[in-house]
Amino acid sequence: MASWLFYIAVFLKQFYLLPSGSIGIADLFFTAACVMTFYGAWKKRTKLFYREDIPWAIFLIFAAIINGIYYVRTANREFPLHTMYWIYSVCLIWMFRTLYSEDFMRGLCWVCRINMVFQLLVLFSGHGRYFRESWGGARFMGTFNDPNQFAFFIFTVMLVLFMGYRRKAIYTAKTRIGFWGMFLLGAFLIGKAKSTGMFVGLLVFFCVLIGQIFWDRCCHSKRKKLWWIGGAVFVVLLAVGVYRILPGADFDVSQTSYTLLSRIQQKIWKLANGNLYDLLYDRSAERLVLEPQYLLYGAGEGFFERFIPYDGFEKLLSPGVFDVFHVNEIHSSFFDVWFSYGIIPAAVLVYWIVRNVIRCDRAQRAAVLALLAESFTLMNCRQPFFWFVIVMAGMSGQEKCVDEKETVEG
């Protein structure tokens, strides 16, 4: 019953009837699944606490205390609200770890495939939502409220499918074609959303995966020099390709056909024509430089209006490069957590991530590294799938250890 409630929640996660940040229908089903999982575990007297998640519990205590202190000082309700977000994430992590099994993962992968096909049907039916730029450009966002939100959902679904694919002991032609077909579908949908953050994630994923394959083949080949020459040629061709897409000094994205490539060129142009303050300002991260003391002990998560840049800050910016004013959270999961809670809680959370990832299948690390690389561009760590991918890495690592132990004993 709990597994089915979980699957329904995953399917409903793509439907946003209320503004982002509100409680959605999927959250209600996730909560119901969590309650049913807890009841089932308590009734069967199975494990209710996992030692692997002790660092998470420590981080949660820090987060509750820090947000509590700032709530007492400011009476701003955003602080307890963000604490509840973290408690919710902990509950979902516990539930996912408890439900994790071969049958559960098979069902989850099927729901992920259904989600991707559904968004494709929404695209071709013409009923999807679009984000309209001020000058007329459009980005597809399916049934979501934001194109980056849509792209992140598709991206994490792709990673879940990859993690499930790598759990298989035997790879048939049907399995390979089925998986990579869905992966290409996901890449196509991300292209429609024109998300540069997800592009970075996919780029890291393929670079790590290709690097692993190249290293393995090179080490076991009798023609190592040939492999090294081939690798060098590939890097040169890649560099030439990057050089060819570099935008000119007068680049204007509004004068292009507005594709993912033109958005990448736009980002490159901004980096080339701006400075460090421009880059930070675009991510709402100027506070990292203006008030670095919070990196030590934390600013709490909420009441972001406190960090409106001081008068005269605009003089540090390059005119005409960035024109968006932010007063919200930092657009980077890692730096937002670090700034909000300080160096010790952030280090504890990083330790938990490393523990879950370090012993998993090498290829699966490509998926986790891609997720972490993408998380530096957007604040996505409140999304359930962000943590599910990391927990999957940890659970597959445990399975690997068990298999190795059984092999040795056998």
Task: Give, region by region, the residue ranges found by the protein language model.
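Alpha-helical transmembrane segments of multi-pass inner-membrane proteins
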Residues: 105-131, 145-215
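Loop-to-helix entry and N-terminal half of a specific, functionally important transmembrane alpha helix
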Residues: 7-8, 181-182, 328, 350-351, ...
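Long extracytoplasmic/lumenal interhelical loops at the membrane interface
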Residues: 271-341
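N-terminal signal-anchor transmembrane segment
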Residues: 1-43, 62-71, 122, 127
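Aromatic-anchored transmembrane helix interface
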Residues: 52-65, 74-99
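Helix-loop-helix junctions and helix-breaking kinks within/between transmembrane helices
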Residues: 16-29, 76-78, 145-148, 178-216, ...
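Transmembrane alpha-helices of multi-pass inner-membrane enzymes
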Residues: 34, 157, 206-209, 367-376, ...
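Hydrophobic transmembrane alpha-helices and their immediate junctions
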Residues: 44, 54, 165-175, 215-217, ...
